[in-house]
């Protein structure tokens, strides 16, 4: 992968000049000038997904210049580097191969000269055998009863991805009840343990090293709770499995290493749901549906790695994001799924994007002088319309939005879905085109009111519009289409990282807080006054000690 400061490229300079020409052009102007705009600025993927990016402040010239930027930053070379197993995560000297986990073509992918696919397939087969035993009831707990509940204990990528997918694919779930514990706050695991029976519960402990503080604290609490009922430590093996590579620690915990599902250092945490970390997904929806999830992602991988930039959906979305972030000064992006099953999708890509591209040092080790990753946030529609859309419509900040919805609902109840989708379509139209003062005044006249007598309120009812959006319409949310959608966003993030000249696949920003917490923890064991920190931290710790009793 080449290390190129994007602002030093000819394409960036051309984009800056183009922005000066485009900054006052409105979306309404663009549609007025081109009645065929939708067909030019939208694309369908696999007859499963329609991506409409026409309601953006872009022209064909904008996209051409953005694609020039991608070429100058050697995006094509970077894609080849990732897919070929090159160690593009240089700060950790690791390959980045979540694409291998869903490589349904089974073509060889080499890391250090070794094909990783046989090991990937072996773990998948092990997940299949294990999950079928649990789901069928063949696997029995220590009292001879079948498993009814599965508790996934993990944090970050070991929690967010599996939780998001099991929720999004709830229509495909079987009889097993799924629970997720992540927070080291004892409340989280306490509330889950109130809902389950030790005789019929399986715990999945998801930690590559089996040393993650939050995960292992929760795992030991779960083990203690279990042993209060089961008594004999030998029963742990029937109720705990590990998603880890540390066989020694797993065995010491009491887990049979035959029930340890491994993954590799080329699997990043926030890209790990495709690996053994996805065992909770397999247990929830069955192995065949998990394979469909992998297949959808693999289809998007093929699209991303083989399609020219001008038709490449992850690349197009990435370039449009850079356009807003670096030229229009937009600091955030909202992800707004109009599907309640997708209620964790924005949170998942909050981690996926912000932990990947929230970096201020470039691949050369220099502090950047441009914007890198945006702030990602969002909630399901229509809830968000009654919460924060006010700011998106009439606030002073530009918030580019992705609207996501399925054409077919899993719950065709009365006219609910038509009402949901009417809002989905209406919001992007309102954001793009707004409502002028003239229209507001005419509405008053149509109601038999004199606008002059209501002059004071008219400005508050004006919508400027010109707020950019992408619309992603899925045929239906299925394992396949969800896999493709997740991979679409993953590759968008990768593309932006390449162009912004940052390392997308490390996360050193999480380390300092952990180090300081490990230093502070022993200081909380007694009642001595603390003076080893700054005055604020000392004051907080000492007040905590005084109040805890």
From Swiss-Prot:
Its EC number is 5.3.1.9. InterPro entries: G6P_Isomerase (IPR001672), G6P_Isomerase_C (IPR023096), Phosphoglucose_isomerase_CS (IPR018189), SIS_dom_sf (IPR046348), SIS_PGI_1 (IPR035476), SIS_PGI_2 (IPR035482). GO terms for biological process: gluconeogenesis; glucose 6-phosphate metabolic process; glycolytic process. The modification N6-acetyllysine is found at residues 80, 228, 234. It is an enzyme of class 5 (isomerase). CDD domains: SIS_PGI_1, SIS_PGI_2. Keywords: Acetylation, Cytoplasm, Gluconeogenesis, Glycolysis, Isomerase. Pfam families: PGI (PF00342). It catalyses: alpha-D-glucose 6-phosphate = beta-D-fructose 6-phosphate. It is found in: Cytoplasm. Its main location: cytoplasm. GO terms for molecular function: carbohydrate derivative binding; glucose-6-phosphate isomerase activity; monosaccharide binding. One of its GO terms (cellular component) is cytosol. Pathway: Carbohydrate biosynthesis; gluconeogenesis; Carbohydrate degradation; glycolysis; D-glyceraldehyde 3-phosphate and glycerone phosphate from D-glucose: step 2/4. The active site is at 355 (proton donor), 386, 514. NCBIfam families: PRK00179.1. Catalyzes the reversible isomerization of glucose-6-phosphate to fructose-6-phosphate. PANTHER family: GLUCOSE-6-PHOSPHATE ISOMERASE. Belongs to the GPI family. This is Glucose-6-phosphate isomerase. It comes from Shigella flexneri. The gene is pgi.
């Amino acid at each position: 992968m080449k290390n190129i400061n994007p602002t030093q490229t000819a394409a960036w300079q051309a984009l800056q000049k183009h922005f000066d020409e485009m900054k006052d052009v409105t979306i309404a102007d663009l549609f007025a000038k081109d009645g065929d705009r939708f067909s030019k600025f939208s694309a369908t993927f696999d007859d499963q997904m329609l991506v409409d990016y026409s309601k953006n402040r872009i022209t064909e010239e904008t996209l051409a210049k953005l694609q020039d930027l991608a070429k100058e930053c050697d995006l094509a070379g970077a894609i080849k580097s990732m897919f070929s197993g090159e160690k593009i995560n240089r700060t950790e000297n690791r390959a980045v191969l979540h694409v291998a986990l869903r490589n349904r073509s089974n073509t060889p992918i080499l890391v250090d000269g070794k094909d990783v696919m046989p090991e990937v397939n072996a773990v998948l087969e092990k997940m299949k055998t294990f999950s079928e035993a649990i789901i069928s009831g063949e696997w029995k707990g220590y009292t001879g009863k079948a498993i009814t509940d599965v508790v996934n204990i993990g944090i970050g990528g070991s929690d967010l991805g599996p939780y998001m997918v099991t929720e999004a694919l709830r229509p495909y779930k079987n009889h097993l009840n799924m629970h997720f514990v992540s927070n080291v706050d004892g409340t989280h695991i306490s509330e889950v343990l109130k809902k389950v029976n030790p005789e019929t519960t399986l715990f999945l402990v998801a930690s590559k090293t089996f040393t993650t503080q939050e995960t292992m604290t929760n795992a030991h609490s779960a083990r203690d709770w279990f042993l209060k009922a089961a008594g004999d430590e030998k029963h742990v093996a029937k109720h705990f499995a590990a998603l880890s590579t540390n066989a020694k620690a797993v065995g010491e915990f009491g887990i049979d290493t035959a029930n340890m599902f491994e993954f590799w250092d080329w699997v990043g945490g926030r890209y790990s749901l495709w690996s053994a970390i996805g065992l909770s997904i397999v247990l929830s929806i069955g192995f065949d549906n998990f394979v469909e999830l992998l297949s959808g992602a693999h289809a998007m991988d093929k699209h991303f790695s083989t399609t020219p930039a001008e038709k490449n959906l992850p690349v197009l979305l990435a370039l449009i994001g850079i356009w807003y972030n670096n030229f229009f000064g937009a600091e955030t992006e909202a992800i707004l799924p109009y599907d309640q099953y997708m209620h964790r999708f924005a949170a998942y890509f909050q981690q996926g994007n912000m932990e990947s591209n929230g970096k201020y040092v470039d691949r050369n080790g220099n502090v950047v002088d441009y914007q890198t990753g945006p702030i990602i946030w969002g909630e399901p529609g229509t809830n968000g319309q009654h919460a924060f859309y006010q700011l998106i419509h009439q606030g002073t900040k530009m918030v580019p939005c992705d609207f996501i919805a399925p054409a077919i609902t899993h719950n065709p109840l009365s006219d609910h879905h038509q009402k949901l989708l009417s809002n989905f379509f209406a919001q992007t139209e309102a954001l793009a085109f707004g409502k002028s003062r003239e229209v507001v005044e005419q509405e008053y006249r149509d109601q038999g009111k004199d606008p002059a007598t209501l002059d004071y309120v008219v400005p508050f009812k004006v919508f400027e519009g010109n707020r950019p959006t992408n619309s992603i319409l899925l045929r239906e949310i299925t394992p396949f289409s969800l896999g493709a959608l997740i991979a679409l966003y993953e590759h968008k993030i990768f593309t932006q990282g390449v162009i912004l000249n940052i390392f997308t696949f490390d996360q050193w920003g999480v380390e300092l807080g952990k180090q300081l917490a490990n230093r502070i923890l022993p200081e909380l064991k007694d009642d001595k006054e603390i003076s080893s920190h700054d005055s604020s931290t000392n004051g907080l710790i000492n007040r905590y000690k005084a109040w805890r009793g």
